[in-house]
Amino acid sequence: MDFWLWLLYFLPVSGALRVLPEVQLNVEWGGSIIIECPLPQLHVRMYLCRQMAKPGICSTVVSNTFVKKEYERRVTLTPCLDKKLFLVEMTQLTENDDGIYACGVGMKTDKGKTQKITLNVHNEYPEPFWEDEWTSERPRWLHRFLQHQMPWLHGSEHPSSSGVIAKVTTPAPKTEAPPVHQPSSITSVTQHPRVYRAFSVSATKSPALLPATTASKTSTQQAIRPLEASYSHHTRLHEQRTRHHGPHYGREDRGLHIPIPEFHILIPTFLGFLLLVLLGLVVKRAIQRRRASSRRAGRLAMRRRGRGASRPFPTQRRDASQRPRSQNNVYSACPRRARGPDSLGPAEAPLLNAPASASPASPQVLEAPWPHTPSLKMSCEYVSLGYQPAVNLEDPDSDDYINIPDPSHLPSYAPGPRSSCP
């Protein structure tokens, strides 16, 4: 009798110590989740409760006939008797929904628990812990190569033989994603808010659940593909820019497409070069002007020295101004020939016969008198004067004759015949 009493005493303790299958879920803020709870018995009360701060107390969130006020219009419970499970859907999750949940059957929440769920709600969603392969867009040839050469990558798509299987999808982005063209072999899926699923089955689970799991994962990959494709596209562009432009290309990512320090150095360098060129031109022009002025001054000095050396003495100028001109004028149209000594008078003959060795201190030119012969008719345009006019002092070398076109202005000469010009 005592044995049975002890057995009944320890029976609740053994039930409480039973380990429940646990599922951990990470959900983005504002997302939704579907929890699949096993249903060991039919036609009983089904519930989802939340573990409170005090141990052993689990507050009912939703049941067959009850919904907590905080979760109204956000939590629904749907039984699936043919699959021996029931679904609990939670939407519009916030950070206040973090915590530990449990689903079970029975009238009391502290008994009949069948599954434990740990829910984490945060703003940024990390990598899915169950995803083993990268789901970004890949070329078809690479996809076929991975399927043939690495079949172990797709092993995670099949349900495991353990008692608990968790299914999580990425959350819905805040903006509407652009449509993505899928191959014709894949059925198009209407976009819905991201759904997170968690369910637990026993090892003897019927194979009828496998197609549903595969279809769910396919729809999950199609739903998250636009977001990850966009991320992979930006990552690839960044790697290409870094590879092509080297480590110093970071300034272009910040919008500085021109190397500013080098550009600032080039501006004063260019301006300084222009100033040097202009200064060189000015100096060259000044040097040329100075050389031209020095050459001009040298020419003027040489001309003055030449004129001073060729100027005669004043006595010679006075004698030269008083000496008469000869009749053999090169500008005269009527030259005269000198007469012989026999035609001269007795007073002039000794002068002509004088020795040549006598010093001509004062040279004089004798003019022969006009012969007493009849005048010859000659055509003359000009008649030269017998005396040289006064010459300016500024031009001592001037020995030119001044011709007067009219013979009426001629001075009176010694008696003798004159040339007649018509």
UniProtKB/Swiss-Prot annotation:
The modification Phosphothreonine is found at T91. Residues 18-262 are extracellular. The keyword Amino-acid biosynthesis does not apply. The record marks H264 as: Receptor capping. Keywords: Cell membrane, Disulfide bond, Endosome, Golgi apparatus, Immunity, Immunoglobulin domain, Lysosome, Membrane, Phosphoprotein, Receptor, Signal, Transmembrane, Transmembrane helix. Phosphorylated on both Tyr and Ser residues. The keyword Nucleus does not apply. It is a single-pass membrane protein. Disulfide bonds join C37-C103, C49-C58. Expressed in pre-B cells, immature and mature B cells residing in primary and secondary lymphoid organs (at protein level). In the spleen, highly expressed in follicular and marginal zone B cells and at lower levels in germinal center B cells and plasma cells. Expressed in splenic dendritic cells and in granulocytes. In the peritoneum, expressed in B1-a and B-2 cell lineages. In the bone marrow, expressed in immature B cells and at a lower level in pro- and pre-B cells (at protein level). Expressed in M cells (at protein level). The chain crosses the membrane at residues 263-283. Residues 290-308 have a biased composition (Basic residues). Residues 284-422 are cytoplasmic. Residues 290-367, 391-422 are annotated as: Disordered. The Ig-like V-set domain comprises three loops analogous to the complementarity-determining regions (CDR) of Ig variable domains, which are responsible for engaging IgM. Mediates multivalent interactions with the CH4 domains of pentameric IgM, facilitating receptor clustering and signaling. High-affinity Fc receptor for immunoglobulin M (IgM), both secreted and membrane-bound IgM. Primarily regulates IgM transport and homeostasis. In lymphoid cells, enables exocytosis of membrane-bound IgM on the plasma membrane as well as endocytosis of IgM-antigen complexes toward lysosomes for degradation. In mucosal epithelium, mediates retrotranscytosis of antigen-IgM complexes across mucosal M cells toward antigen-presenting cells in mucosal lymphoid tissues. Interacts (via Ig-like domain) with IGHM (via CH4/Cmu4 domain), both secreted and membrane-bound IgM; the interaction is glycan-independent and multivalent theoretically involving up to eight binding sites for the IgM pentamer. This is Immunoglobulin mu Fc receptor. It comes from Mus musculus (Mouse).
